[in-house]
């Protein structure tokens, strides 16, 4: 996957001594950190928040139960340093914002308020909990239909983008012509998914709002190597794009 998104070439240009990048991952939470498999990851759990339960415990409960673990996978793709898995963030620090569960995603707008420093149900903010650290990027893997460019969510994401936050979102899983939000918001980078042969994954939403495509998943053996291309699965495409911010 690193070769597909030209990570080696990018490192030749910018060098590996990049500035730390603070990335908010709005998903199902972070892994249970005492697990030694994630000792090399940089998850700033003390900076994050569980928007659904409205508490500071943004752990990925589903991961701990050996079940759904989308947030753990995405966060590790961004920040994993070693132990058999290398992420592409190069010192990226992940702030888990828990908004997603097995049955879907919930209080995403509250998460935008939290990250933007606005009043929200948590009574705190990213700036307060991080000690005034800058937020560089946001990663969102959820979406839905029926949005608009003038919605409160798009406006709030626009405010964050105007502050210099690079915002990436999965384009969605609806196929050709399907439009998902917030990926279609004016100042959000929409990222489609490619399969093992660098073609569009069959499920990936394709529309005029898609800005990039990256490895994202396919449940078939497109390259005829006898192994399902499931290694790319779950449409984690945006996590390969947004960590390229090195400022």
At which residue positions do the language-model features occur?
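Structured segments of extracytoplasmic/periplasmic soluble domains
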Residues: 77-81, 114-121, 160-163
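Short clusters of small/polar residues that mark proteolytic maturation junctions
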Residues: 99, 235-236
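Catalytic-core segments of hydrolase enzymes
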Residues: 21-24, 29, 74, 127-235
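Short pre-catalytic strand/loop immediately N-terminal to key active-site residues, enriched for Gly-Thr
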Residues: 57-66, 236-247
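Subtilisin-like serine protease catalytic core
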Residues: 8-110, 131-136, 184-187, 197-199, ...
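Soluble non-cytosolic domains of exported or imported proteins
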Residues: 4, 20, 68-69, 106-109, ...
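Catalytic-core regions of hydrolytic enzymes
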Residues: 104-125
